[in-house]
Amino acid sequence: MTAVRVLVEGLDHPEGVTVAADGTLYAGGEAGQIYRVDPSTGTVDQIATTGGFLLGLCADGDGRLYCCDVARREVMRFDPNGGALLVYSTGSPDRAFVNPNWPAFDDNGNLYVTDSGGWKEDNGCIMRVDATGTTTVWSEASTAFPNGCALSADGLSLYVLESTAPALIRIPIGEPDRRDVIASLSGVPDGVALDTDGRAYVFYYRPDRIDRVDPDGAIETLAEDPEGTLLSAPTNGVWLEPDRTRLVVGSLGRWHLTECDFGATGIRLRYPTIP
């Protein structure tokens, strides 16, 4: 695995990673820690804690972080500049979060959040929190433990990994009841990132593997670690700014972040302005 190396160490089983608009790298921990990471120096600073268990993270245009806390069953918002930590969403009025897993913004400030539901209970859904903070059930097309998600480059589709199907699917933003299967997978897929060629990078909880899926569904394994030391439950990844040619991958099974260079360029995340 010559394209894969340990980037930084000293984190508590980090599942989620994200990059803010200014290029700052953040990660979460299994005791609710929010970490700020400097890839150039290897410095890891814990800047806050929710007291729960963090899964996915993303950032808005002002650099505030939106963190899925599975223990609290809430999406929390944290301002790294002012230190304010608050509850952003507990789910919709008629359906509370069961397992809020991964958040992704669109350009209009809508936050799509996968609610995985129970393991193998086929009761997951995707919620949407609009820019005013109102939460609704957006789609029930994906029920098989919807996990990581990513908005397409054109903003017209949401890519979702279903851990228990297992499959990579796509839901058109304008047709939330539609579920298009891009590829049937094996193992337990967890997170997804997209590149500028329309390919999806799939990160697995089990086995310790990273695949690349072409738009036509062809699957290529890019890295696998039978020992589970360099890649250890590599659950999610994010492209490092500014060039977005390096993927930073979480290691839920250990205490480090991994850097991967697969000869590709990632798409830029959305950073909308939220009141």
Task: Mark where each language-model region is.
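Short loop/turn segments that connect beta-strands within beta-propeller blades
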Residues: D38-G42, D79-G83, V129-G133, P172-P176, ...
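Beta-rich, blade/repeat-based domains predominating
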Residues: E9-D22, A31, T50-D69, S92-S116, ...
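A basic- and aromatic-enriched beta-loop-alpha substructure that forms the phosphate/nucleotide-
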Residues: R64, V70-M76, P80-G82
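Structural signature of WD-repeat beta-propellers
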Residues: G29, V70, S163, Y204-Y205, ...
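A short beta-strand motif characteristic of beta-propeller blades
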Residues: A3-V8, G42-A48, A84-D94, T134-E140, ...
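C-terminal closing repeat unit and adjoining cap/tail of repeat-based domains
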Residues: R206-P275
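Beta-propeller domains
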Residues: Y26-D45
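A short loop-to-beta-strand structural motif that recurs across blades of beta-propeller domains
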Residues: Q33-Y35, E74-M76, G124-M127, A167-I169, ...
